[in-house]
């Protein structure tokens, strides 16, 4: 069990109770839509779309493998941690259906890892400012999903913080492993054009 009472954990009960107590049908609907962004089904569709588009454009399977390793790996890692910790969910009204152990948050982990992986792939040929914007959007998605899980009463605050950390950690590990392969990728047509012009 993960204890509560000091540091960040001291906010666990307060956040869970505040979210449940102040919920409205409108806020619950909005938070439910946000939390869907961290669902495995939604992320699998997003990863498949981005991977397919990138494969058609760049013709290199390394990015496809990277994206699926990030998603599958973070889900397996997080489920393993859930099994080890086996923490109960907050004893408040759950505003959406849920099951299984609470720590760490699977939606938070999956959103954190996969949103950054997609941003890295989509924006790798963009300008520095464009890549920064993509990273900012990915971070916003991760934080929004994490907040939604806590405010919907299905996770403690420490669950979503830990889940986000797991997700970002798995993304960084995957990016390091695939880093050389990803950096060598580029638009084949653009590379051919540069070669004809005699530019590197």
Regions found by a protein language model. Give the residues of each.
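N-terminal transmembrane-helix/juxtamembrane module of multi-pass inner/ER membrane proteins
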Residues: 1-42, 83-95, 199-200
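Small-polar-interrupted transmembrane alpha-helices in polytopic inner-membrane proteins
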Residues: 68-87, 134-147
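Membrane-helix interface segments
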Residues: 26-27, 59-64, 91, 128-133
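Membrane-helix interfacial "entry" motifs
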Residues: 25-32, 55, 59, 63, ...
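Hydrophobic alpha-helical transmembrane segments in multi-pass membrane proteins
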Residues: 43-44, 75-79, 111
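Alpha-helical transmembrane segments of multi-pass membrane proteins, especially transporters
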Residues: 17, 66-71, 137, 160-164
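Interfacial segments of alpha-helical transmembrane regions
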Residues: 47-74
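Membrane-embedded catalytic cores of phosphoryl/pyrophosphoryl-handling enzymes
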Residues: 49-50, 94-200
């Amino acid at each position: 069990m993960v204890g509560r009472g000091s540091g960040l954990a001291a906010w666990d009960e307060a956040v869970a109770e505040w979210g449940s107590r102040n919920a409205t049908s409108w806020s619950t609907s909005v938070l439910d839509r946000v939390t869907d962004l961290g669902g495995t089904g939604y992320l699998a569709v997003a990863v498949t779309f981005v991977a397919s588009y990138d494969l058609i454009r760049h013709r290199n399977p390394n990015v496809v493998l990277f994206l699926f390793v990030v998603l599958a790996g973070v889900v397996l890692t997080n489920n393993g941690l859930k099994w080890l910790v086996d923490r109960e969910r907050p004893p408040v009204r759950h505003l959406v259906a849920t099951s299984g152990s609470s720590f760490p948050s699977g939606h938070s982990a999956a959103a954190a890892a996969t949103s950054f992986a997609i941003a890295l792939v989509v924006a790798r040929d963009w300008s520095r400012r464009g890549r920064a914007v993509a990273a900012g959007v990915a971070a916003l998605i991760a934080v929004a999903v994490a907040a939604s899980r806590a405010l919907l009463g299905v996770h403690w605050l420490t669950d979503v913080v830990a889940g986000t950390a797991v997700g970002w950690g798995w993304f960084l590990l995957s990016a390091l492993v695939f880093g050389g392969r990803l950096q060598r990728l580029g638009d084949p047509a653009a590379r051919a054009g540069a070669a004809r012009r005699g530019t590197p």
